[in-house]
Amino acid sequence: PSYNYARFLDACLSSILMQDYENFEVLIADGGSSDGSLEIIERICAQDNRFRLVSTSDHGQADAIEKAFSHATGEFLCFLNADDCYLCVDALRCVVDTFNAYPSIDVLSLGGYYLDAHGHWTRPIKYRYHPLDGFHLMRYRTAVLQPATFWRKKVSDEIGWTTQFHFVFDVVFFYAAYQKYSWLELPKPVAGYRMHGDNKSGFVKSPRINELVKFEEIKFGSHSFRVFYLIGIGAVVRISEKMGLVGRLLNLLLYKLVNLLAFASAYRLPGI
């Protein structure tokens, strides 16, 4: 998916072009960019017929991904946002070799690094930093490094994408995949997750909290404590959003406090 990230798009597409595994297709769904992204996409597509622009309008990121995957012909799938990239030339080869070596796995999740806005590696991404964390806690904390996660085509064909979600659609998808399919986690860092200040999931926003509430309802039911807990947090966030700079500082404090409590409770309390 691509939308007004022209400043990162070249790096994203170039990281795919440099792969030493050549049997791939790239299906690009642009949401109507007006910053020069389409010109970059059209140039790459003209240079290499493995790249195709399949959509120029959508109703959000999940809808864009669903449209793109409707054209997919490959056996293994993933999606890479326009502000992210692959870090090594053998990322796709590693994925194909691993799936072929382990025919019983359906989802493969690899490692990655945070990048700054200039593409510099800053620190490794560690989603399993709690001593008790693991796949057995996926119901409480669906921790998946999206740009480094790949799956067999049948997974998304059967699960589909919840297009009513805009902030947590990927988490909803991966949780559904966790419930039904076999997973393998490997530490090899293949993907860069770019932190540039405009990341959609990088802020505490009331619409995102609302979606997390709906996600908890899917997992635990509408009357669970986790649902009411997040509803209360959402109410505080909505108030702070009207308070300018003070509100932003309050949101930052709330973000740290809620996630600290989630960690301390081994994620029996939800994070945000």
Predicted regions and their residues:
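Short, acidic, metal-binding catalytic loop of nucleotide-sugar glycosyltransferases
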Residues: 14-23
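Acidic donor-binding/catalytic loop of UDP-sugar-dependent glycosyltransferases
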Residues: 36, 63, 84-98
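Short beta-strand/loop segment that forms part of the nucleotide-sugar
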Residues: 23-32, 52-57
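Conserved donor NDP-sugar-binding/catalytic core segment of glycosyltransferases
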Residues: 89-122
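Glycine-rich, basic loop-to-helix element that forms the pyrophosphate-binding segment
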Residues: 55-72
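Conserved nucleotide-sugar donor-binding catalytic segment
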Residues: 110, 116, 124-215
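Short aromatic/hydrophobic "clamp" motif used to bind/position activated sugar donors
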Residues: 77
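A conserved acidic beta->alpha catalytic loop
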Residues: 30-39, 81
